[in-house]
Curated annotation (Swiss-Prot):
Top-level taxonomy: Eukaryota, Metazoa, Ecdysozoa, Nematoda, Chromadorea
Gene3D superfamilies recorded: GroEL (3.50.7.10), GroEL-like equatorial domain (1.10.560.10), TCP-1-like chaperonin intermediate domain (3.30.260.10)
Main location: cytoplasm
Subcellular localization, as worded in the UniProt entry: Cytoplasm
Gene disruption phenotype: RNAi-mediated knockdown results in severely reduced microtubule growth rate.
NCBIfam families: chap_CCT_gamma, thermosome_alpha, thermosome_beta
InterPro entries cross-referenced by the UniProt entry: Chap_CCT_gamma (IPR012719), Chaperone_TCP-1 (IPR017998), Chaperonin_TCP-1_CS (IPR002194), Cpn60/GroEL/TCP-1 (IPR002423), GroEL-like_apical_dom_sf (IPR027409), GROEL-like_equatorial_sf (IPR027413), TCP-1-like_intermed_sf (IPR027410), TCP-1_chaperonin (IPR053374)
Pfam families: Cpn60_TCP1 (PF00118)
Swiss-Prot/TrEMBL GO biological process terms: protein folding
Taxonomic source organism: Caenorhabditis elegans
UniProt-recorded name of the protein: T-complex protein 1 subunit gamma
Keyword presence, Repeat: no
Keywords: ATP-binding, Chaperone, Cytoplasm, Microtubule, Nucleotide-binding
Length: 543
């Protein structure tokens, strides 16, 4: 760049790389298409599995979109944002991770045509936003039905359509029952608002060995811990429980101190002082007559001795999350210092404490009939199988939660996408100006979902898609027609009982289009200098 005196003005440093204009947009579109192509075959009941090696040398086998992309290392910033949307989709709704990536890739691919025709990105974005608003409105008002959330059989149908594409589909009824039971256990109504916090109050405990059919929901908590002393009780009915967040051992000073001891009896006095401090802590606990003490920190041998003499069973080094879940089960309050313990801090709601040996490990069960925290115990032949079953179960738990919070359903199997595509086609025909073309392009992009389902079944894509378009165009009542993902035939989803939660599909549409809009607005990528490596790094270090 030159100023008035023809002197070059350097704005960016030499190591900085800059790409701008049309080249950047095409690069972003290609990155999105590449990511979409990676997991295109992982959509639907006939989905292929991907085998991935993680950096630690472990193997992941899955067809879960988010799990696949999480293991892939990419350089391109647009590809990174695509991986991010799969994670967002998984956290928000637990399902639709593969769909959202495929749809975003297709929406970006359709934008390329208009960018090459020199259409301004702002016009494309405006049309995309308009299409998104219309689609959300149609999905909620035209193409959805409400489900009765008190009827488990109705919810089960929806969960089955979600799990049909997963590995756990062979144990469908078991997975459905576990999901519904777990979500109903942790459901809490506060001031008319329904709260279902799966992450915090529903833990999945994986125990290798046994059969998948042995998996169950435990109303309470299960932790991989054993009692500290062989003479402590392993089974207590209706226990009084104290939960602590402090050490039951002598507190060491903050700074390093040294003592000079001149007489022998001084050592005894110091040791006596340590013992007194621990005895005081234990007496404060024993005063409340608990049966069980759980702490997040350590318990010294001396403290174990005092508690054992008082007939108290204790466990140490619990995770904070487990302690909070335990507080919900037994009604106790987590106390940070033994001197603050009051009678109301003791939990009495738990009905049974039991230490059980499963395979070579000991597991502690604390259960109650009426509780708002639960643990799903998963069994299976190997670690890989259990990990995949856990991923599938997480998805089905989220599906049940979504239905409980928003009981509206839309047809699966690409039926909703085809119905929306037809509406966009009709609405686009009434529009005028340049905006109508990108608007109608969204309708074409939506067809990627049923098309991919047909492809993954090995069906004839062109013939089936033409047939499906004809069915939807023939009669407005045919909005429930879609693709049977197992056989590749065109079926009424109402008869096949394949329904998705509205929240999932709307989130897919929102995330895919909003990401495309964000990426289309990028016209410049400036990448800074990379860190110096090897010899250069050593040279730069101060002498």
């Amino acid at each position: 760049m030159r100023g008035a005196g023809q002197q070059p003005i350097i704005v960016l440093s030499q190591g900085t790389k800059r790409e701008s204009g049309h080249q950047v947009q095409i690069g972003n579109i290609n990155a999105c298409k590449t990511i979409a192509d990676v997991i295109r075959t992982s959509l639907g009941p006939r989905a292929m599995l991907k085998m991935l090696m993680d950096p630690m040398g472990g193997i992941v086998m899955t067809n879960d979109g988010n799990a696949i992309l999480r293991e892939i290392t990419v350089k391109h910033p647009a590809a990174k944002s695509m991986i991010e949307i799969a994670r967002t989709q998984d956290e928000e709704t637990g399902d639709g991770t593969t769909s959202v990536i495929i749809l975003a890739g297709e929406v970006m691919a359709h934008a390329q045509t208009y960018l090459e025709q020199k259409t301004h990105p702002t016009l494309i974005i405006k049309a995309y936003r308009q299409a998104l608003e219309d689609m959300i409105q149609w999905s909620e008002n035209k193409f959805s039905k409400t489900v009765d959330i008190t009827d488990d059989a109705e919810i089960a149908k929806v969960v089955k359509s979600c799990l049909g594409t997963k590995m756990i589909s062979k144990w469908m009824d078991l997975a459905v029952n576990i999901s519904i039971q777990a979500v109903k256990t942790i459901r809490v109504e506060k001031a008319g608002v329904r709260e279902i916090d799966i992450k915090r109050y529903c833990r999945i405990e994986k125990i290798p060995g046994g059969r998948i059919e042995d998996s169950q929901v435990v109303k309470g908590i299960v932790v991989n811990k054993d009692i500290l002393h062989a003479k402590m009780r392993r089974r207590i009915e209706n226990p009084r429980i104290v939960l602590l967040d402090c050490n039951l051992e002598y507190k060491k000073g903050e700074s390093q101190t040294s003592l000079e001891i001149m007489r022998e009896e001084d050592i005894s006095a110091i040791l006596e002082q340590e013992e007194q401090a621990i005895r005081k802590q234990c007496d404060e606990i024993i005063k409340l007559k608990p049966d069980l003490v759980f702490t997040e920190k350590g318990i010294s041998d001396l403290a174990q001795h005092f508690l054992l003499k008082a007939g108290i069973t204790c466990l140490r080094r619990l995770k904070k999350t487990d302690n909070n879940r335990l507080a919900r089960v037994c009604g106790a309050r987590v106390v940070h210092d033994t001197s603050d313990l009051r009678d109301e801090d003791v939990g009495t709601k738990a009905q049974l404490f039991e230490v059980v040996k499963i395979a070579d490990e000991y597991y502690t069960y604390v259960t109650a009939e009426t509780t708002t925290a639960c643990t799903v115990v998963l069994r299976g032949p190997s670690k890989d199988v259990i990990n995949e079953v856990e991923r599938n179960l997480q998805d089905s738990l989220h599906v049940v939660r979504n239905i409980m919070i928003n009981p509206k359903l839309v047809p699966g199997g690409g039926a909703l996408e085809m119905a929306l595509s037809r509406e966009i086609e009709q609405q686009g025909a009434k529009m005028d100006g340049v905006k109508k073309w990108p608007y109608k392009a969204i309708g074409l992009a939506l067809e990627v979902i049923p098309r991919t389902l047909i492809q993954n079944c090995g069906g004839s894509t062109i013939r089936k898609m033409t047939e499906l378009r004809a069915i939807h165009a023939q009669n407005a009542e045919n909005w429930t027609f879609g693709v049977d993902g197992t056989s590749g035939d065109l079926v009424d989803m109402n008869k096949l009982e394949i329904w998705d939660p509205l929240a999932v599909r709307i989130q897919v549409l929102k995330t895919a289009i909003e990401t495309s809009v964000m990426l289309l607005r990028i016209d410049d990528i400036v990448s800074g200098t990379k860190k110096a490596v090897g010899g250069e790094k050593q040279e730069m270090m101060p002498q």
